Amino acid sequence: MAAEMLLASGHHLVAKDYRMGRYQADVITKKDGVLFVVEVKYRKCVPQEAWHWVDPRQIQRLLFLGASLLSEHQCSEVEVWLVGFSPELDTPILLPLDVN
């Protein structure tokens, strides 16, 4: 469902459930020269700050994974995103994750 949501907004699917050694990404897409490494989370409740669903170490690992794939997919930058699902939400949360 997360991949379909991104594809509907013009992204091109690179991989689902991608693994490289100890690194793993739920979805990888690309759009306009940007490689998007996406973490998908499901929570029963919605916290005030959804970006806490992914810890900083995991964001760093996702960023490293994306950076290692840049040239292979002819992209110039990497963004790490969260797609969050909850029964309390009508639509999923989609937001960029900052590594700081």
Residue positions per predicted region:
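Short secondary-structure boundary/capping segments within folded domains
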Residues: 17-20, 28-29, 72
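Short, C-terminally biased terminal segments at protein or domain edges
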Residues: 86-100
